[in-house]
Amino acid sequence: MSTQAVTGVLVDSWATKSRVRNAVLVLGLTGFTALAAQVAIPLPFTPVPLTLQTFAVLAGAAALGAERAVLAQILYITLAVAGAPVLAGGASGREVVVGATGGYLIGFVLASYVVGKVSSRGASTKSATTALAFVTGSFVIYALGAPWLAYTTGNTITWAVINGVARS
């Protein structure tokens, strides 16, 4: 008895591929990320609020794969720069995107790629591998977010790691 390896991301196992479908999936993940950003808890010790965005980014990448997830996050950031109130607390604008949270937003794009690539190799069907992909994706987000937070706030990297990673 042989078993066939499962490859591809979750969404590809139940839906036929088409450009329209891909566009809807990208728009859906963009919307999911924007909604998750609205679940924001301001923290008194950092300008970066605690949100559900990281979960939306990682889950979306695992479900949709790297290409669609990266496009969704680029669209999300583009909408924010254009003035759509999609960031935490309904914030928007170029100054917000390049502000304290900018590194995390760029991290969303790179984490989407990493988690999406791992998931496209069948990881989205294995809990342990998916968990490891999520941890790796979170590391990517924080590895870009913390230094950017330190730079934009004029604080040390130690302060940024404590206040922008460890406490969140």
Q: Where on the chain are the PLM-derived regions?
A:
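Short helix-perturbing small/polar motifs within transmembrane alpha-helices
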Residues: M1-A15, R21, L35, R94-I141, ...
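Hydrophobic transmembrane alpha-helices
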Residues: S2-V70
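Hydrophobic residues within alpha-helical transmembrane segments
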Residues: G28, I74-T78, L110, L132, ...
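Aromatic-anchored segments of alpha-helical transmembrane domains
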Residues: T30-Q38, I77-V86, S138-L144
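Alpha-helical membrane segments and adjacent membrane-interface helices in multi-pass membrane proteins
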Residues: V39-V114
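Juxtamembrane helix-boundary/capping and inter-helix hinge elements in multi-pass membrane proteins
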Residues: A66, A123-S124, G154-W159
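Individual transmembrane alpha-helices with interfacial aromatic-anchor signatures
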Residues: T101, A160-S168
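Transmembrane alpha-helical segments of integral membrane proteins
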Residues: A143-T158
